A protein has these predicted regions:
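Sec-dependent signal peptide recognition
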Residues: 1-7
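Low-complexity, acidic Ser/Thr/Pro/Gly-rich terminal tails and inter-domain linkers that flank the onset
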Residues: 7-26
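Structural beta-strand segments of beta-rich domains
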Residues: 28-32
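Asparagine-centered strand-capping/turn motif at beta-strand->loop junctions
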Residues: 34-41
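The feature marks short-to-medium sequence segments in extracytoplasmic or secretory-pathway proteins
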Residues: 47-89
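Short Pro-Gly-centered flexible turn/kink motifs
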Residues: 88-102
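Terminal connector regions
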Residues: 104-144
């Protein structure tokens, strides 16, 4: 069953990768970089909401420090239905990348090992594809 899951994820038209510096100081910004890649044969319209492509306007991440949840402290946007301006086109074989500073939306002022998973998955309009973004880990060190 695990092989089937991995195969399904590998064949998804929209691939999501997340990255941050693996070690940083608590007094430094920490950009979360999201890279979306269209592995499909046709273009995809990707909704920017709940992603670094838009910035922080929703609680879209599960973040823990030493297995304790870190609450979201950023702005919350009240939304209706998305309009055409809320999507961007990602052509077949194309990749797009955006980043947003995690320290603007989450309290990362304590040293320790953090785990981040993306709860709100990027959405696509044309194929209904919602990729799984990988879980990532990083360490915050005391201020220098």
């Amino acid at each position: 069953m695990m092989t089937l899951l991995l195969t399904t994820l590998a064949l998804a038209p929209l691939q999501c990768d997340l990255s941050v510096k693996t070690q940083s100081r608590v007094n430094e910004p920490l950009p979360l970089v999201m890279t979306l890649t269209n592995r499909g044969e046709g273009p995809l319209e990707v909704l920017s909401w709940f992603t670094p492509f838009e910035g922080w306007f929703a609680d879209a991440i599960d973040l823990t420090l030493d297995d304790r949840p870190i609450p979201y402290k950023g702005p919350l946007a009240k939304r209706g239905n998305p309009g055409a301006e809320d999507f961007f086109l990602l052509g077949a074989g194309q990749q797009s990348q955006a980043d947003a500073d995690l320290t603007l939306a989450y309290d990362l002022s304590r040293p320790g090992r953090y785990q981040l998973s993306y709860r709100a998955q990027p959405l696509t309009l044309t194929r209904g594809v919602a990729p799984r973004c990988p879980v990532i880990h990083f360490t915050r060190l005391p201020a220098s």
